[in-house]
From Swiss-Prot:
<comment type="similarity">
    <text>Belongs to the uridine kinase family.</text>
</comment>
<comment type="pathway">
    <text>Pyrimidine metabolism; CTP biosynthesis via salvage pathway; CTP from cytidine: step 1/3.</text>
</comment>
<dbReference type="GO" id="GO:0005737">
    <property type="term" value="C:cytoplasm"/>
</dbReference>
<dbReference type="Pfam" id="PF14681">
    <property type="entry name" value="UPRTase"/>
</dbReference>
<keyword id="KW-0418">Kinase</keyword>
<dbReference type="GO" id="GO:0043771">
    <property type="term" value="F:cytidine kinase activity"/>
</dbReference>
<dbReference type="InterPro" id="IPR000836">
    <property type="entry name" value="PRibTrfase_dom"/>
</dbReference>
<keyword id="KW-0597">Phosphoprotein</keyword>
<dbReference type="InterPro" id="IPR027417">
    <property type="entry name" value="P-loop_NTPase"/>
</dbReference>
<feature type="binding site">
    <location>
        <begin position="63"/>
        <end position="70"/>
    </location>
    <ligand>
        <name>ATP</name>
    </ligand>
</feature>
<dbReference type="Pfam" id="PF00485">
    <property type="entry name" value="PRK"/>
</dbReference>
<dbReference type="GO" id="GO:0044211">
    <property type="term" value="P:CTP salvage"/>
</dbReference>
<keyword id="KW-0963">Cytoplasm</keyword>
<dbReference type="GO" id="GO:0005524">
    <property type="term" value="F:ATP binding"/>
</dbReference>
<keyword id="KW-0539">Nucleus</keyword>
<feature type="modified residue" description="Phosphoserine">
    <location>
        <position position="276"/>
    </location>
</feature>
<dbReference type="InterPro" id="IPR006083">
    <property type="entry name" value="PRK/URK"/>
</dbReference>
Length: 501
């Protein structure tokens, strides 16, 4: 369903390590690099984070049955160098058949090649959901049984590129309006027949006579009447024969250039989130930094000591994490109840914490440092996982996978855990994932041990200052200008905690 290809070395150099080189990012005040961000122009304007999967690049590939659409689509998917590319076949949207139509289908008397045979309304709804960054379910169709597979769907979320292929991919105006690039694969109908016979007999268990009968009665007439005219809707027409390599490569290069522009724009927006007017973000009532008590300061000192061994580091971090979590739990949902004391006295309308209304989502892997403390604080808590990593070439954050508790939107409080926040890019993306799953922003609380002011500023600007952040230690911009605090720009907590340093 998705393809992970090694990144190309030919990248725009001005964007390499924008989000990874935290020293440059912070000391230049989310700096204006290569003229990419004008702080004066952004002053007074509100910024809002738009994740890359909210604006996926959608490619439609149409053509007659057997023209080679699937081969062209597979070539594009394997070459465009985007990990989260989804290939969707319109064959999955064939309408389910009743008993009579199924009997006709097995006799090769049912017309699968007319437009009404495909549920284009459902196809449009699913593609629109992907275009809007929402989770969607793609049905699965079985040509062996001539029906949709019961209770089986392909769940898609977070796609950056969507490739739609099918005989009517370029037919419906609503689908065409969602596409960024439309391709028609042209082939002689005799070639289409030969390919179709090979495919249907080998892959779909059909007999030769039935295939030829269906071709002459339904496939060929509909190809001439309905499919061929969709050629006029295409942005590019390529031949389906073996000599189409040049045409396909030209299209692939065009797609790559468009995707690189899209990636660069994503990075520009992330940088812009940190370029708001220099107001004091650390004094807002939604930012909660652990009070610097003697115990807390001592724990900070021990955790930052290079000579502390792994076992002691884990012990002291768990201790500090428990303090931090206990502080964050002051805000959890409560209910009123009646209890009986050990002395058999009744207490009415007292407050009880609803721990079953609390869940946590760890950002792998630094968020996993909180696992022990979470289990000690709320033993039966449900925990989800998100894996977000930066592209090694561009620094762009990318969602690799998400494992969230069922019905997570019904919880009253969701803790989003991370060991360190430096640029804030991964946390911003993680919050957006939760929002896409129906969680109210007010229910989300970020829990982090170490954070920079730059990262916090980005998070607040991305979500209109509505995210509560509980931090063990926050490093201000002024402190970062002091070389003694340069250690705060290096990720080390998860490596130290898990003994990987």
């Amino acid at each position: 369903m998705s393809h992970r290809i090694a990144p190309s070395k030919e990248r725009s150099s001005s964007f390499i390590s924008i989000l990874d080189d935290e020293t440059r990012d912070t000391l230049k005040a989310n700096a204006v690099m290569d003229g990419e961000v004008d702080v004066k122009k952004t002053k007074g304007k509100s910024s809002r984070y738009i994740p890359p999967w909210t604006t996926p690049y959608i490619i439609g590939i149409g053509g007659a049955s057997g023209s080679g659409k699937t081969s062209v689509a597979a070539k594009i998917v394997s070459s465009i160098n985007v990990p989260w590319t989804v290939l969707i076949s319109l064959d999955n949207f064939y309408n389910p058949l009743g008993p009579e139509d199924r009997a006709r289908a097995f006799k090769n008397e049912y017309d699968f090649d007319e437009p009404n045979a495909i549920n284009l309304d459902l196809a449009y709804k699913c593609i629109l959901n992907l275009k809007e960054g929402k989770r969607t379910n793609i049905p699965v169709y079985s040509f062996v049984h001539h029906n949709r597979v019961p209770d089986k769907n392909i769940v898609i979320y977070g796609a950056s590129v969507v490739v739609i292929e099918g005989i009517y991919a370029l037919y419906d105006r609503r689908l065409l309006d969602l596409m960024d690039l439309k391709i028609y694969v042209d082939a002689d109908l005799d070639v289409c027949l030969a390919r179709r016979l090979s495919r249907d007999i080998v892959s779909r268990g059909r007999d030769l006579d039935g295939c030829i009968q269906q071709w002459e009665k339904f496939v060929k007439p509909n190809a001439v009447k309905f499919v061929k005219p969709t050629m006029k809707n295409a942005d590019a027409i390529i031949p389906s024969m073996s000599d189409n390599a040049t045409a396909v490569n030209l299209i692939i290069n065009h797609i790559k250039s468009k995707l690189e522009l899209k990636s660069n724009e994503h990075l520009r927006e992330l940088i812009k989130l940190g370029s708001s007017p220099s107001q004091d973000v650390l004094n807002r009532n939604i930012i909660h930094e652990l009070p610097p008590t003697n115990q807390v300061l001592s724990l900070h000192t021990m955790l930052l000591n290079k000579n502390l061994n792994c076992a002691d580091f884990v012990f002291y971090f768990d201790r500090l994490a428990t303090i931090l979590l206990s502080w964050a739990l002051d805000d959890i949902p409560v209910a009123h109840t009646n209890i009986i004391t050990p002395g058999e006295h009744t207490m009415e309308n007292v407050i009880a914490c609803q721990f079953d209304q609390v869940t946590a989502v760890n950002i792998i892997r630094s968020g996993d440092c909180f696992m022990k403390s979470l289990r000690k604080t709320i033993p039966n808590i449900t925990i989800g996982k998100l894996l977000i990593q930066s592209d090694s070439q561009t620094g762009e954050p990318q969602l690799h996978c998400e494992f969230l508790p069922p019905n997570i939107e019904k919880f009253g409080k969701v803790f989003l855990m991370e060991g360190q926040i430096i640029s804030g890019a991964a946390m911003i993306m993680a919050i957006q994932v939760l929002l896409d799953h129906g969680i109210d922003l007010e229910k989300i609380s970020v829990v982090v041990y170490l954070a920079t002011e730059v990262g916090i500023r980005r998070i607040l600007n991305a979500f209109d200052n509505k995210v509560n952040i509980f931090a063990g230690m926050i490093i201000s911009r002024e402190k970062l200008q002091n070389h003694q605090y340069k250690w705060a720009l290096t990720r080390f907590f998860d490596s130290k905690y898990f003994g990987c340093d």
